[in-house]
């Protein structure tokens, strides 16, 4: 069984505080007594302000900065534009923007600044300071040189209004990012300006990469006939030449360091040979081929007979040498000193008996056949 209870004062106050205007009018009409109406009205006026229990709507995201607006704010400072009001320069700057080759860079820079502004506020992120840091880094033309670099000519018409024109032969060049060879993103720009102390309170979002990036090449064409651009190009070439020379010097030193060990080792070997030369009477064989021809061991009658003769003579005792036919003892005084002899341990024999001199006599047959020493096959 449900019991009916009277509401507490806090519950009544909460009920009244959460009523709409129309509902409050209905409540006033339900109170018929004037004294009760007066008391209700007094309590209503003394009640605290109504607090909406619903979460407050989040602040609407600020609109990203327009790239053309920032381009106009930067290049309105062209010295030749100072004598005219902004309403006469808007069309001129619009023409410059249409022909500018760096629109993508301006869009990227303005997006980076908008990201900083949305987090820390415009007061903590001065726009002029932002562009004064990033524009020279990306090598965007200075306002004082913009018209000259891109071939624009400023003239004044008959009514005194400024006009700009461009020669048909003028060729605009993409001036910018000449010293960057990577994909440029919003995070890259923010990191660069923060390195100079700009927007120090800004905290980059972690693990989030911007989908906006720009790839730039280092070999961008420059104005050939413009002195300012030519000077910039010359300075870049000088820097590259210095870098190349430095790399060559480093490579040369490294090569000398690596080859120095081999040179020192060769010198040590040479010094060792000079200090301890080989003996003069030591036989040093010349290099020879290990692929010598194989001897031909076919029978040869001449050498077989010579071998048998020597073997037979050596087997006879030397004491009987004098009794052999056509032999003499070495001590025999009858040996002629003008004749060659073959000796072997008190054994002597007449060499003419072994050598045929017929081929060497005067008037001998020049076609005589000599013995063939063909025990080794000649290649």
UniProtKB/Swiss-Prot annotation:
<keyword id="KW-0278">Fertilization</keyword>
<dbReference type="GO" id="GO:0005634">
    <property type="term" value="C:nucleus"/>
</dbReference>
<dbReference type="GO" id="GO:0008301">
    <property type="term" value="F:DNA binding, bending"/>
</dbReference>
<dbReference type="InterPro" id="IPR006856">
    <property type="entry name" value="MATalpha_HMGbox"/>
</dbReference>
<protein>
    <recommendedName>
        <fullName>Mating-type protein MAT-1</fullName>
    </recommendedName>
</protein>
<keyword id="KW-0805">Transcription regulation</keyword>
<keyword id="KW-0238">DNA-binding</keyword>
<dbReference type="GO" id="GO:0007338">
    <property type="term" value="P:single fertilization"/>
</dbReference>
<dbReference type="GO" id="GO:0045895">
    <property type="term" value="P:positive regulation of mating-type specific transcription, DNA-templated"/>
</dbReference>
<keyword id="KW-0539">Nucleus</keyword>
<comment type="similarity">
    <text>Belongs to the MATALPHA1 family.</text>
</comment>
<feature type="DNA-binding region" description="Alpha box">
    <location>
        <begin position="60"/>
        <end position="117"/>
    </location>
</feature>
<keyword id="KW-0804">Transcription</keyword>
<dbReference type="Pfam" id="PF04769">
    <property type="entry name" value="MATalpha_HMGbox"/>
</dbReference>
<comment type="function">
    <text>Mating type proteins are sequence specific DNA-binding proteins that act as master switches in fungal differentiation by controlling gene expression in a cell type-specific fashion. Transcriptional activator that induces the transcription of alpha-specific genes.</text>
</comment>
């Amino acid at each position: 069984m449900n019991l009916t209870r009277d509401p507490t004062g806090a519950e009544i106050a909460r009920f009244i505080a959460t009523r709409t205007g129309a509902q409050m009018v209905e409540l006033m009409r339900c109170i018929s007594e004037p004294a009760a109406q007066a008391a209700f009205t007094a309590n209503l006026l003394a009640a605290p302000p109504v607090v909406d229990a619903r979460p407050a709507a989040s602040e609407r995201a600020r609109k990203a900065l327009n790239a053309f607006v920032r381009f106009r704010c930067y290049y309105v400072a062209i010295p030749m534009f100072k004598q005219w009001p902004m309403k006469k320069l808007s069309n001129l700057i619009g023409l410059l923007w249409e022909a500018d080759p760096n629109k993508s860079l301006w869009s990227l820079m303005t997006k980076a600044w908008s990201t900083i502004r949305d987090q820390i506020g415009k007061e903590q992120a001065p726009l002029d300071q932002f562009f004064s840091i990033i524009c020279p880094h990306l090598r965007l033309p200075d306002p004082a040189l913009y018209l000259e670099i891109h071939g624009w000519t400023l003239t004044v018409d008959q009514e005194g209004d400024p006009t700009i024109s461009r020669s048909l032969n003028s060729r605009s060049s993409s001036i910018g990012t000449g010293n960057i060879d990577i994909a440029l993103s919003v995070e890259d720009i923010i990191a660069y300006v923060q390195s100079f102390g700009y927007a120090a309170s800004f905290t980059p979002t972690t693990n989030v990469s911007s989908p906006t990036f720009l790839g730039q090449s280092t070999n961008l064409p420059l104005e050939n006939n413009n002195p300012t651009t030519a000077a910039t190009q010359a300075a870049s070439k000088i820097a590259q030449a210095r870098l190349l020379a430095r790399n060559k010097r480093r490579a040369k030193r490294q090569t000398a360091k690596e080859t120095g060990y081999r040179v020192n080792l060769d010198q040590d070997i040479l010094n060792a040979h000079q200090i301890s030369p080989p003996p003069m009477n030591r036989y040093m064989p010349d290099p020879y081929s290990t692929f010598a021809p194989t001897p031909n061991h076919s029978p040869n009658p001449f050498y077989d007979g010579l071998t048998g003769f020597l073997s037979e003579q050596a087997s006879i005792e030397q004491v009987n040498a004098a009794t052999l036919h056509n032999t003499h003892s070495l001590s025999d005084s009858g040996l002629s000193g003008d004749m060659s002899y073959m000796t072997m341990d008190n054994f002597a024999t007449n060499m003419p008996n072994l050598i045929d001199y017929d081929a060497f006599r005067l008037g001998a047959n020049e076609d005589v056949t000599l013995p063939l020493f063909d025990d080794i096959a000649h290649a």
